[in-house]
Amino acid sequence: MGILALVTDAVSLPIDYDMPPLLEACRTVGITAEVCDWEDGTVDWSRFEAVVFRSPWTWAERQAEFLAFCERVSHVTRLITPMPLVRWALDKRYLADLAAHGVPVIPTTVVAPGSDALAAVRDFLAARPEAREFVVKPTDGCYSKDVQRYQRSLAEPASRHVARLLANGSHVILQPYVESVDRHGETDLTFFDGVYSHAIHKGAMLMPDGTVHVPTLDFRQARDADEDQRAVAAAALAASVAHLGLDLPLVCGRVDLVRGADGSPMVLEMELCEPSLNLTFSEDGALRFAQALAERLKP
């Protein structure tokens, strides 16, 4: 078995809480793993048996550069996350694809660069008279960067936010704010090779006053997912595999769910390329991940 590269970056590694338990689990199952910085131009990627993206989260500021990096690396070694999945999973427009496959998702409107931001926000609110609050987010962000919660009356400030994101070349998502999040938070489910492993509860990140919390460990706690949640998350992963025409289940993935007005689970978002997997909240999660990776590394 060759060497496995665990890809991160210098900024993100200190907040990659999964890396220490994953490295230990890799040693346990006999994987030789090295932590590598995708921004380090001196790395010889051809010497690795395979590459798995763990926390290269600076991609959000340099998406085109990151995708070009992934393409280059894919020509000299094997990406555990194949390129079609990388491109698709880093753009939250995948929510429309999930919905087309019948997966329940938060109602989502996408605004394209070149659109009139104020008109887009007003049209969205007109179509959602029940939405007392709404959320603006880029389709290509992570860690709640550039995400904001707005009162319905704040269409103009929200439109300025949308305009700024559009000017940067991002598509923008508009969604009604799901009020149950304030009471119940979200449930984030982790899967390995399509099989449920564990879940956590995460408290609300977007505050009514506009404060946006960073999802540190303080906002997370272990929580088992119920059968309805597991079924929706599994359906989302199966739809992802079907949509992309992949031959294997995803080696890892996280599906974040919230409760709709009727209490049923729906997808908030997924992390399938470089997910934080909440391994510190599961006794055996890191080992299950390492075992899934070991299966992919078999000749």
Curated annotation (Swiss-Prot):
Q: Which InterPro entries match?
A: ATP-grasp, ATP_grasp_subdomain_1, DcsG_Biosynth_Enzyme
Q: Which domain of life is it from?
A: Bacteria
Residues forming the ATP-grasp domain are 95-298
Q: What happens when the gene is disrupted?
A: Cells lacking this gene do not produce cycloserine (DCS).
How does pH shape activity?
A: Optimum pH is 8.0.
Effect of mutating C142A: About 80% activity on D-OUS, 40% on D-homocysteine and beta-aminooxy-D-alanine
Q: Which reaction does it catalyse?
A: O-ureido-D-serine + ATP + H2O + H(+) = D-cycloserine + NH4(+) + ADP + phosphate + CO2
UniProt GO molecular function: ATP binding; cyclo-ligase activity; metal ion binding
Cited function? Involved in the biosynthesis of the antibiotic D-cycloserine (DCS), a cyclic structural analog of D-alanine, used as an antitubercular agent. Catalyzes the synthesis of D-cycloserine from O-ureido-D-serine (D-OUS). It reacts with D-OUS, D-homocysteine and beta-aminooxy-D-alanine.
- In Swiss-Prot or TrEMBL terms, this protein is called Cycloserine biosynthesis protein DcsG
Q: Which organism is it from?
A: Streptomyces lavendulae
Tell me what gene encodes this. dcsG
